Structure formats: C-alpha cells, structure tokens
C-alpha cells in the first residue's frame, strides 16, 4: 500500500532518497522548492519492517489553455527496479494524484541503462511507452 509523504514523514523520506543507490537530487523535496511553478508531491511504499522501500516524487504543472496538468517524476522512482510490486504500488499512488490534479500524462525517467531491457519491458507492462535511443535529450533525459 502506498502513502503520500507529509511534513511528518518528510525527514524519513529525504533520508531514504539520499541513502538509496537510485536516489537522486531531482527526487528531493529541495528540488521541488526550486520549481515554484510546479507542485511537489511524493509517494512512498513501506516494507514489512515499516521502513520506506520505494518512493516516487512527482512535479505537477498546470498546462496553459488545456486546463490539465503534466506530472513528471524526474529520475524516479527510487526503488529496486526489479521489484514489480513496489513499482506497481508507486504507480497506483501516482495515478491517484494524476486523477486529483487532472493530469493528462505521467512521465518518468529513471536512471536506467538503455541495455536494461527487463526494466523497459516492466514499464510497457504498466502501460508506459518509452522513447528509443538518444544520447542527447530526445527522450527527456539522455540514455547511455
């Protein structure tokens, strides 16, 4: 089951992101503070021990004219990318936020080598479409 990060759980969340191998500054609350036109939200999933085992911070921005929002999880999620259950729970949380904020799309760009076909197959199984190739910025972030 996922949960939304609150002021009460923010320090624990930040410690998790900083210590996880897939953690990235773009998943930090502090990164969200640098983007005043965006709303920062984070989702977490806990293990049986009660500790955070996966998270996804998303930035939400209202798009002019269309009255909808764009949801972007820059360099997220932060979790074991082979853990289908955790990924699915994080995505369920993102979908709930997308509904609340009337998002027309959820974009993520985890730090995953382009050779990791297993992860890209996992993304497709959850309905994501990935941009192939591009060592520049064709796919939001470069892929190597």
Model-derived segments and spans:
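Acyltransferase donor/substrate-recognition loop-hinge adjacent to the catalytic core
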Residues: 1-10, 124-144
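Short amphipathic alpha-helix that is part of the acyltransferase structural core
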Residues: 1-29
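Conserved donor-binding loop and adjoining core beta-sheet/short helix segment
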Residues: 32-111, 130-135
């Amino acid at each position: 089951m996922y949960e939304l990060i609150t002021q009460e759980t923010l320090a624990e969340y930040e410690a998790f992101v900083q210590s996880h191998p897939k953690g990235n500054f773009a998943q930090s609350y502090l990164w969200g503070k640098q983007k005043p036109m965006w709303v920062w939200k984070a989702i977490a999933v806990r293990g049986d021990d009660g500790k955070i085992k996966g998270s996804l911070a998303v930035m939400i921005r209202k798009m002019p004219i269309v009255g909808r929002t764009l949801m972007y999880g820059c360099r997220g999620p932060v979790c074991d990318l082979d853990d289908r259950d955790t990924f699915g729970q994080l995505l369920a949380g993102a979908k709930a936020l997308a509904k609340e904020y009337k998002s027309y799309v959820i974009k993520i760009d985890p730090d995953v080598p382009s050779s990791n076909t297993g992860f890209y197959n996992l993304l497709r199984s959850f309905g994501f479409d990935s941009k192939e190739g591009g060592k520049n910025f064709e796919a939001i972030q470069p892929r190597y």
